[in-house]
């Protein structure tokens, strides 16, 4: 059950998060996904308080929601606040609860998207709805963007929007993106908030192997597939060197100070 100590704003964020989880928006990859129902729900929440949303459908069912909240100072550059509304698949047999139930258990909201990232989507929505109810006007324009397809390359989401509708981001110089980490509770109940400064990059490789042509009816000791498999296994066994940047060293030092 929800604690009675939560503020009205927190309670709304919790409720919205639960509802978002209950609307499956599973991204299966290779263009197979459907965010329309959750996009319609988000658009309705914004419209309800006078924020005008626009849904951009990049392909059937692949929907992005964009809205602009006007700020008090039009001279200041706009700020994009964005999240994604798709989730990875969930095998119900692997869960102790229905992954699309949004149930509250042990003080946590459970379900696919509770961490990545319908929680953040809910906080954004609850906050801007509160702004409208209380009459708060931000200093700069706030552009809300709820993207499709983040879990499978963003082809139908952010890439589509930037390529086909760059005008919605006109005048923006900064963006607040996906949550970068979570607090860690250490000895004595002290809560530490970790700061992320970089992420691992990606390197695509194309491996080519040659062998002797053959047939399934005869053994072949010069098989290209076997040679390719051995190369992939060798990469997998490689022990990468440990490199500690200044940031990582500072992290170790501060953690040691806080935990003793």
Question: Which residue ranges define each predicted feature?
Answer:
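Solvent-exposed residues in well-ordered beta-strands and their adjoining turns
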Residues: 70, 208-212
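Acidic/His- and Gly-rich active-site-bordering loop/insert found
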Residues: 3-112, 131-140
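Predominant activation on well-ordered alpha-helical scaffold segments within soluble catalytic domains
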Residues: 14, 18, 43, 122-129, ...
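Fold-independent oxyanion-binding glycine-rich loops
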Residues: 83-85, 178-180, 209
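A generic structural motif
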Residues: 115, 150, 211-217
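Acidic-enriched catalytic cores of C-N bond-cleaving enzymes acting on peptides and small amides
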Residues: 166-173, 181-190, 196-204, 216-260
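Acidic/histidine-rich catalytic neighborhood of metal-dependent amide-processing enzymes
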Residues: 109, 115-194
């Amino acid at each position: 059950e929800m604690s009675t100590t939560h503020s009205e704003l927190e309670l709304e964020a919790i409720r919205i998060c639960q509802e978002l989880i209950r609307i499956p928006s599973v991204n299966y990859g290779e263009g197979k996904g459907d965010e329309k129902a959750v996009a319609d729900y988000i658009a309705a929440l914004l419209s309800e308080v006078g924020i005008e949303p626009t849904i951009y459908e990049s392909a059937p069912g692949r929907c992005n929601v964009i809205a602009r909240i006007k700020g008090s100072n039009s001279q200041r550059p706009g700020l994009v606040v964005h999240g994604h509304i798709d989730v990875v698949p969930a095998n119900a047999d692997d869960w102790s609860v229905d992954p699309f139930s949004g149930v509250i258990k042990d003080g946590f909201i459970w379900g696919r998207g509770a961490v990545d990232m319908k929680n953040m989507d809910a906080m954004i929505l609850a906050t801007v709805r509160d702004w409208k109810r209380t009459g708060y006007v931000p200093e700069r324009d706030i552009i809300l963007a709820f993207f499709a397809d983040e879990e499978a390359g963003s082809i139908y989401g952010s890439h589509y929007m930037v390529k086909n509708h760059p005008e919605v981001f006109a005048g923006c110089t900064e963006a607040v993106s996906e949550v970068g980490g979570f607090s860690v509770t250490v000895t004595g109940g002290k809560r530490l908030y970790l700061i992320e400064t970089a992420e691992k990059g990606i390197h695509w490789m194309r491996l080519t192997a040659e062998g002797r042509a053959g047939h399934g009816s005869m053994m072949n000791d010069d098989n290209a597939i076997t040679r390719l498999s051995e190369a992939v296994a060798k990469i997998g066994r490689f022990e990468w060197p440990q490199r500690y940047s200044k940031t990582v060293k500072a992290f170790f030092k501060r953690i040691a100070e806080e935990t003793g």
